[in-house]
Every structure is written in structure tokens, then in C-alpha cells.
């Protein structure tokens, strides 16, 4: 794939952009097999590949420059000058067109980007999410205060007329002078408050603050793989810890008698419940609880426990708790293989029966890994 930003060295986030994709896959595969050296080579399944371009459904743009010449993108690592990334080839063509329009719309609307040195201005970030199923967008303006809302509201009709696919628009208030992406307060500027996405026939509800996978093509295969593994095992009861908006639980519910999804973020749980209602699933229960606290409060484990923790992993305490609960099966999905490997050391009673990785972020070193662990 050719990327002008990478060739000009203005953005080097995709560190392996110049490496042929087949070679990227081979390098990652070898690195993961080396990291998990205790896993039998025969346990590894073929990796799930990504499209090399137009594969991301989310864009997180820093608002830079001045009101008369705003830029959506990043700061140059050389001299700090603003670099526009609105035409990043990882985004869909529709997303690129909308981002380019927004960059000009911000200028004509007179919305000043926030200057972190002078601590002046309003617009900090523009966050864009696209539903591949419906082609609709959720657009969030992260601003320092409510001072910019009047200008945003006044100019919204022009934006919506130009891009009617923008279904959800909100302003997130982030007043703190820190490199924090978003604040607590979300002000909706449209009647619609969420997007509808669909993977493998399963509806998914996407709200502003809920975590959602960035690569829909690969995410769909991740969920389908977990569903297929669970379908083979046919557990009586299954827990989905760190369930987010319910992607794994919703896919696996038809193949278990009872599924319980646990997630600390209430907004994500509300999304998961709405998806379950749309599917008409009655053997699935979601609760807004801390996954570690829920697990530690149980005296008897489910037949199968699926975990999908954040980058920090499960940690020693929760890993040891799962070891003591002695569930027959664990499915561990991880966005950080290093912490996953550390957690597996605290699960000595389990053998890795199946391992597969998913190239969620092509052209980088990152990989999503999922393993089926069986109690020995």
C-alpha cells in the first residue's frame, strides 16, 4: 500500500508500511509463536488477515492550527507543525471525504482549535466513527468548554445537508489541560444518540464512550471464531468478562444455556442490552459491574469463561482467581500478547488447545490473539 504521509515521513504510525503485507504476517506470526513458546505449534491456526487499506472505522483527529487555518491530524515530530491526516488511506473513502469537509467546515464556522501552549481556543479533538453496515457516522467534537457550542449548533444544518449520513453528533466537554481524549459530559446535538452496526447478522449498538473494535472486517471474524468455538463446547453457563457492548456474548448466546456479560461501563451495558432486545435473546443477562469483583464474589464457576481485558491484561490477582474457580474452559481474547503471556503463567492448570491471531492493525506490530484454554 502506498501512503504519502509515510513516504514524506510526516506520519510514521504505520511502522511497517513499506514491508510487503505477506512479510508482515510472517514476521508477526513468528514473533507470537516465539512469545508463546510453551504453546504447541500444532495449536496455532492460520492468522486472520486484514485489508491493507480502508480498514478502519474510527478516526481520532487532533484539532490544530488557528481558527482561520485549522488542521485535523497530528503535530510534526520534527518541529511541531500541524499535519493534516484527513486523507489517511486506512480510513474509508467516505470517512476521508467527511474529514476533509470538516476541516474546512471548522474554518468557515470560526471554531478555534485549542492551543495547548497558550491554553487558548476550544476545539481539542474530532472523533469520527462509521457503521459499515449502514454507512452512517457518529461525530464527536471534544471541546474545552460550552463556549463553542453556539457556533457548532449554528453551522450544523450546513454540515448535515452536505453529509446526511452523519446520524449522531455530540460535543464532549473536556476542560482539563491534559492529554486526555474526552471528559465526563456529553451533550448530544442530534435526536439520535447511537449508531447501529452489524457483525455476522448480530446487531451492535455503538455509543460515544463505549469501546468498539476499530477494524470491522477483522472484528467480525474474531466474534465468529469465538462463536464457533463455543458452539463446539456447548457450555451450560458462560461468563463474558469485560464484555463491552456485548460482541462476544451476543454471538455466543445461541450456543449456551445461559450467558452472563459483565462490564464496568454502564453505557456499554445499555448498548449490549439493547442489542439483546433486538435479537430477542432471553438467555442472556448483562450487568454493569467490575469484572474482577464479580469473579471474586463467585463460589462456583461457569463451564466456560470468556475474558477480553484491556491492554493491561487480567493481572495476577484475577488470573489466580480464575485458576481457583476451575472453569472447564477459558477463552482469552487479548489486544496485548505480552500481558496475555504474563497472565497465562498464573493459570498453570490450563493447556492451550487452540490459538489464533487477528491482524486488527495492519502495518504495525500490534496483534489481537485469542486462545482456547482447557482445564487439565
UniProtKB/Swiss-Prot annotation:
Signal peptide (residue range): none
One GO BP annotation of this record: rRNA base methylation
One Gene Ontology term of the molecular function aspect: 4 iron, 4 sulfur cluster binding
SUPFAM superfamilies named in the record: S-adenosyl-L-methionine-dependent methyltransferases (SSF53335)
InterPro entries, per database record: 23SrRNA_MeTrfase_RlmC, MeTrfase_TrmA_AS, SAM-dependent_MTases_sf, U5_MeTrfase_fam
Reaction equations catalysed: uridine(747) in 23S rRNA + S-adenosyl-L-methionine = 5-methyluridine(747) in 23S rRNA + S-adenosyl-L-homocysteine + H(+)
Keywords, ordered alphabetically: 4Fe-4S, Iron, Iron-sulfur, Metal-binding, Methyltransferase, rRNA processing, S-adenosyl-L-methionine, Transferase
Record carries keyword Isomerase: no
Residue positions binding S-adenosyl-L-methionine: 213, 242, 263, 308
Active site: 335
Keyword flag Nuclease: no
Function: Catalyzes the formation of 5-methyl-uridine at position 747 (m5U747) in 23S rRNA.
HAMAP family, per the entry: 23SrRNA_methyltr_RlmC
Sequence similarity: Belongs to the class I-like SAM-binding methyltransferase superfamily. RNA M5U methyltransferase family. RlmC subfamily.
Record-given protein name: 23S rRNA (uracil(747)-C(5))-methyltransferase RlmC
Organism in which the protein naturally occurs: Vibrio vulnificus (strain CMCP6)
Lineage: Bacteria, Pseudomonadati, Pseudomonadota, Gammaproteobacteria, Vibrionales
Name of the gene encoding the protein in the UniProt record: rlmC
Amino acid at each position: 500500500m502506498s501512503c504519502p504521509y509515510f513516504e514524506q515521513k510526516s506520519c510514521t504510525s504505520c511502522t511497517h508500511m513499506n514491508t510487503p503485507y505477506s512479510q508482515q504476517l510472517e514476521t508477526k506470526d513468528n514473533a507470537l509463536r516465539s512469545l508463546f513458546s510453551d504453546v504447541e505449534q500444532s495449536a496455532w491456526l492460520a492468522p486472520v488477515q486484514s485489508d491493507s487499506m480502508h480498514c478502519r472505522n474510527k478516526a481520532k483527529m487532533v484539532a490544530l492550527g488557528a481558527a482561520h487555518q485549522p488542521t485535523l491530524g497530528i503535530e510534526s515530530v520534527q518541529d511541531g507543525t500541524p499535519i493534516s491526516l484527513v486523507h489517511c488511506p486506512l480510513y474509508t473513502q467516505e470517512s476521508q471525504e467527511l474529514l476533509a469537509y470538516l476541516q474546512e467546515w471548522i474554518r468557515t464556522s470560526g471554531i478555534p482549535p485549542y492551543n495547548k501552549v497558550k491554553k487558548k481556543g476550544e476545539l481539542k479533538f474530532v472523533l469520527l466513527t462509521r457503521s459499515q453496515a449502514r454507512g452512517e457516522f457518529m461525530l464527536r467534537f471534544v471541546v474545552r468548554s460550552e463556549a463553542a457550542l453556539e457556533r457548532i449548533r449554528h453551522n450544523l444544518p450546513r454540515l448535515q445537508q452536505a453529509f446526511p449520513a452523519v446520524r449522531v453528533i455530540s460535543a464532549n466537554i473536556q476542560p482539563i489541560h491534559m492529554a486526555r481524549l474526552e471528559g465526563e459530559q456529553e451533550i448530544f446535538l442530534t435526536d439520535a444518540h447511537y449508531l447501529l452496526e452489524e457483525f455476522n447478522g448480530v446487531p451492535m449498538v455503538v455509543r460515544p464512550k463505549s469501546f468498539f473494535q476499530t477494524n470491522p472486517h477483522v472484528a467480525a471474524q474474531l466474534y465468529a471464531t469465538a462463536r464457533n468455538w463455543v458452539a463446539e463446547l456447548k457450555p451450560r453457563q458462560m461468563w463474558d468478562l469485560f464484555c463491552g457492548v456485548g460482541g462476544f456474548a451476543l454471538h455466543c448466546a445461541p450456543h449456551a444455556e445461559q450467558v452472563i456479560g459483565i462490564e464496568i461501563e454502564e453505557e456499554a451495558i445499555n448498548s449490549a442490552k439493547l442489542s439483546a432486545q433486538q435479537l430477542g435473546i432471553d438467555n442472556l443477562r448483562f450487568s454493569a459491574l467490575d469484572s474482577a469483583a464479580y469473579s471474586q464474589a463467585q463460589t462456583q464457576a461457569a463451564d466456560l469463561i470468556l475474558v477480553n481485558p484491556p491492554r493491561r491484561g487480567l493481572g495476577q490477582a484475577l488470573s489466580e482467581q480464575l485458576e481457583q474457580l476451575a472453569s472447564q474452559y477459558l477463552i482469552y481474547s487479548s489486544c496485548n500478547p505480552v500481558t496475555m503471556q504474563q497472565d497465562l503463567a498464573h493459570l498453570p492448570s490450563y493447556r492451550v488447545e487452540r490459538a489464533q491471531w487477528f491482524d486488527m492493525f495492519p502495518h504495525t506490530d500490534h496483534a489481537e490473539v485469542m486462545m482456547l484454554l482447557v482445564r487439565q
